[in-house]
Amino acid sequence: WATWFRYPHKYSEVLDALPKLVAEVEYAVRAHDWSPEACRLASSVYRLARPVLKHAGRADLSGLLADRAMRYAERTGDPILIGAASWSVGQAMLTGDMPEGALDFVTRAAERLEPLLADGTPEQFSVYGGLLLCAAIACVRTGDPWRGRQLLHGPAREAAKRVGDGKNYHGMVFGPANVAIHTVSLEAEAGETGDALRLADEVDLAVVPSLERRTTFLYQVAHCYEQRDNDAAVLVHLQMVYRQCPEEFQYRRPARHLVETLVRRARPTFAAEVREFAARVGVLG
């Protein structure tokens, strides 16, 4: 998890390690007769594998990996681990273009955690809040952005106050900054690019402990600028992504698509710089 969230060469390192990790946890589960600790570790590995393979172009495996994470989480009987696995299932449903199913699934999962919140720990509020963030994005994809806004500005924001920034329980990176990032994402997906860019100016990436969250946010902002034909701003934000994680342009197709679009339509005043950047990230030549 630390490599995935922190290191510039996260794709090559994690993809190289994943096959061995999966084999080891599968062996451990059976060698220890499905013990809670072995199942906890297996669930964690499959929750990690889902976003890694999704961004590396194997989104078709999201459902299978999330299902494995849930199967092992349920064997532990730990409601927080089950909640984290439910978040992974919800994300897989969004990837598979099933927002209605995702919304129902993660909403029910969040409701099951509510009895724990009266004296809840930051970890419990983090998992609960992560489920709400997934639900908010599902709302906008089902055509109900107002409900998504209510989730973000209400219970998600309140839960984030109980967690604070700089935390990363169960790989969910939940906290005030991630709520703000999802607010930008929701407005962008709702077609409100002006509002999305205005809100993006208020996001402090310095307190976000996840490289994936930071680069995804920068992609979202770049895409908003692309829709407003501000190609210079698109280039600036893609350069910011490259400085943080050069491998993004090797593995993430949407990033390459943004560069390809820039190459086609960049104005003469900075077209040469766009071509130089495209060559550097491997889109040209």
Predicted regions and their residues:
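Conserved binding/catalytic microenvironments
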Residues: 1-285
